[in-house]
């Protein structure tokens, strides 16, 4: 039986003085180890999702940690029968997840994590508002029961939604979620900076939730959209039927 492909997602909000200098080093290590995927670099940190053998993706992760001088990295690994990415790309960006809000200090303002095992109980409380921070096309594929859909086309539209719905959110316990956790880091930071006090988010995102709980209470409805050739995964994190992007 052939070895399954490991898919590693990792992000960290860490100051990188010259992110462009990391590009050739990461490309060299990644290509030498036959790793495929995308790594985004900016002065605010890094965000990557890449696939290969378990050993190879972890070598790239260790290189990222070394080059950015950080151990504080959010990491998620799952597995696939084949590579969900077609090649390795390392790109320089203004933000590792684009929200277009200047001077937002994610490490200073951050929501409180809710562990996956506690999420179902928390979001069914009467005084909790649940907000899906993802885009509308992702929400259409699947979301949590009773979650608010901001109907955004891009994450850059989320701040405007937050401003327009400030009264709706005022004084409430706000539970937010996204695919792997990174958008929640920024969206909870935004709401905290706006003065909302009780702001929470699902630790590890939907993917970690499905892995840990198998959706045992059926509060997750549908499939989870992902940004690779699988397009969507089911409760068991296997590619959802009918979504796989055929290679040309």
UniProtKB/Swiss-Prot annotation:
UniProt protein name: tRNA uridine(34) hydroxylase
What the protein does comes down to: Catalyzes oxygen-dependent 5-hydroxyuridine (ho5U) modification at position 34 in tRNAs.
Top EC group: oxidoreductase
Q: Name one GO biological process term.
A: tRNA modification
Which residues are annotated as active site?
178 (cysteine persulfide intermediate)
Disulfide-linked positions: none
- Gene encoding the protein: trhO
An example molecular function term from Gene Ontology annotations = oxidoreductase activity, acting on paired donors, with incorporation or reduction of molecular oxygen
Q: Which SMART domains does the entry mention?
A: RHOD
């Amino acid at each position: 039986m052939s070895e399954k492909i490991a898919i590693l997602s990792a992000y960290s909000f860490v100051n990188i003085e010259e992110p462009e200098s990391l590009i050739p080093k990461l490309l060299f290590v990644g290509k030498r180890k036959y790793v495929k995927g995308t790594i985004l670099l900016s002065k605010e940190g890094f965000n990557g999702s890449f696939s290969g053998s378990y050993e190879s993706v972890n070598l790239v992760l260790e290189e990222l940690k070394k080059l950015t001088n950080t151990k504080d990295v959010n990491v998620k690994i799952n597995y696939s029968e084949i590579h969900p990415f077609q090649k390795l790309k390392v790109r320089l960006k203004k933000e590792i997840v684009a929200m277009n809000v200047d001077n937002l200090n994610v490490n200073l303002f951050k929501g409180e994590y809710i562990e996956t095992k506690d999420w179902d109980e928390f979001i069914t409380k009467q005084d909790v508002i649940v907000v899906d921070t993802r885009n509308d096309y992702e929400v259409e594929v699947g979301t949590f029961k009773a979650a608010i859909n901001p109907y955004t086309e891009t994450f850059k539209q989320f701040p405007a939604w937050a401003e327009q719905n400030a009264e709706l959110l005022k004084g409430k316990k706000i539970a937010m979620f996204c695919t792997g956790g990174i958008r929640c880091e920024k969206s909870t930071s935004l709401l905290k900076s706006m003065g909302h006090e009780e702001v929470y988010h699902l630790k590890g995102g939907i993917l970690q939730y499905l892995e840990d709980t198998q959706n045992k209470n059926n509060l997750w409805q549908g499939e989870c959209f992902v940004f690779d050739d699988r397009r969507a995964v089911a409760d068991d994190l296997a590619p959802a039927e009918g979504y796989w992007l055929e290679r040309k």
